[in-house]
Amino acid sequence: MKFLFDLFPIILFFAAFKLWGIFTATAVAIAATLAQVAWVAFRHRKVDTMLWVSLGVIVVFGGATLVLHDEKFIQWKPTVLYWLFAVGLVAARYAFGKNLIEKMMGKQLTLPEPVWDKLNLAWAAFFAALGVTNLYVVRNFTESQWVNFKLFGTTGAIVVFVILQSLWLAKYLKEE
C-alpha cells in the first residue's frame, strides 16, 4: 500500500498529462505532493526527509516549469532528485558515519555491517544511473515518451532492482 501511496503524485501527473498536457500535469504533481506531505504529517506527525526533499524539488522545478512555461525543468526534476538521493546516501555514510539504508531497513533485516555498506552503495549507484537514464530519455525522446518512461520505466526499474536486491540479500539472512 505504501508503494502505491508513494506513486500517487506520479500517477496523477501521468493522468493529467494525458488529459491536459505538461503544464497542468506539473501543477497537479505539485498539489498532489503537497497533499501527500500534509496527509503524512497529519497521520504520523513526522514526515520522512526523503518526502520533504521530494516536495522541495517538485516545488522548485515544477514552479520553474510553470512560471517560465518551459517543460525542461519538470523533466530535469527526477534527475536532480535521484542525484540528491545518491549523494545523500554516500555523504551520510562517509561524511557522517550513518548508513541511511540500514536506518530505513534495519528493523526488518539483520545484516553484517559490510553488507549494509554494499547495499547503501548499490542504492546510490542505482539512483545515479536512474538520473543519467532520465536525462538520456529527456534528450532523445518525445515529451510523451518521457512521461511514459517516468511512470512505467522508472517504476519497473525500481521493482527489478528490489527483486535483484532481495535475491542477493537472501544469502545473508539468518533463518529464525
Swiss-Prot record:
Q: Know the name of this protein?
A: Inner membrane-spanning protein YciB
Q: How does it sit in the membrane?
A: Multi-pass membrane protein
The transmembrane segments are 3-23, 49-69, 72-92, 118-138, 149-169
Please name the InterPro entries in this protein's record: YciB
**Compartments (UniProt record):** Cell inner membrane
Role played = Plays a role in cell envelope biogenesis, maintenance of cell envelope integrity and membrane homeostasis.
In terms of Pfam families, this protein maps to: IspA
Q: Which UniProt keywords apply?
A: Cell inner membrane, Cell membrane, Membrane, Transmembrane, Transmembrane helix
Protein family membership: Belongs to the YciB family.
One GO cellular component term noted in the UniProt record for this chain: plasma membrane
- Record keywords: Transport included? no
